Amino acid sequence: MNNTECLKTFKINGIESGYNGYFKLDILKYRHSLYRGGSSDTVSRELFVRGDAVVVLLYDLSKEVVVLIEQCRAGALMHAQKIGQNEQAWLLEPVAGMIDFQETPQQAGIRETKEEAGVEINELEYICQYYPSPGACDEILHLYASEIDASLLPEYAGFDTEAEDIKIVQIPFEQARLKLASGQFNVSSTIITLQWFFYQKLAQLKA
């Protein structure tokens, strides 16, 4: 352990609620150690309290397809409107969803796959976990993959009660790889899971 690591300490001085609805916004006040010694002044940051989520990339080795879901996403609406391209509000992503209280990431992945892709899975292969936006959000994404029989997939899925309107999209391996290499995917979980699949999973299978 070096000296820089020894200095990494912090103290949370207060947490105030800024908003408490479907999502939460807290105002976090804290101090932390400095690289050059001493402590920072009190830092105040608005923190989007979202909780952890799970992501599951589905694939079918026999059909040589990866499976993504397409849906209209609130986070993409404003940019799509700004550039005058409505279709840009529809994004291609792996199955994903929030992890419920007292639920493991694996349990959430199995549940979300049934809800969003209409198929049952029993096994998940761990990919990684990461913070998608650590400067303002506490969310951690837990990424997994699962092999399925793509012939069992419906064309559409989603719960009406959750305003979900989902299209199931099967993309041939080579087409998905080329889209990935040319920067045509614009969601971090899509990019990371596909990079793992093509450059680690398939590479191991071919070795």
Q: Which residues fall in each region the model found?
A:
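Nudix hydrolase/Nudix homology domain
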Residues: 2-14, 70, 83-90, 101, ...
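Acidic, metal-coordinating catalytic segment for phosphate/diphosphate chemistry
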Residues: 20-65, 71-79
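Short, well-ordered beta-strand micro-motif
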Residues: 27-29, 58, 145-147, 170-172
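Active-site-adjacent beta-strand/loop module that shapes the phosphate/pyrophosphate-binding cleft
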Residues: 30-34, 133-154
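Conserved Nudix-box catalytic region and its N-terminal flanking loop in Nudix hydrolases
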Residues: 45-48, 65-111, 160-162, 166
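Hydrophobic pocket-lining residues within nucleotide cofactor-binding pockets
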Residues: 61, 99, 121, 148-149
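A mid-sequence, solvent-exposed acidic-amphipathic segment
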Residues: 114-137
